[in-house]
């Protein structure tokens, strides 16, 4: 890591708490208003493993409510736009981006990843 960019988090929760965050596995279904904000917050908190799932593209109408949406990425897959954003915050993060629509019949990719939490 570049220095210890999570040192303030570590001061708050201790080194054991930070290690737990860095080993946590969280899946996020949808990168809209809630999912894109959750993804960024979890990344900035130090959660080390994120699975981000969304089949949609960034639209101009998303600008008013979605952190992933900027004019620069209109037309991009939301997973690609979110990857650009998260990697600029934490380039060493273990992020998996899946540009698919989650359905019961294709659930294997989610459960094979073994998340501790799903947003």
Residues covered by each model-derived region:
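A structured beta-alpha segment of the ubiquitous adenosine-cofactor-binding alpha/beta core
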Residues: 75-117
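Electropositive phosphate-/nucleotide-binding environments in soluble metabolic enzymes
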Residues: 11, 15, 32, 36, ...
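A generic local structural motif
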Residues: 12-16, 39, 104-108
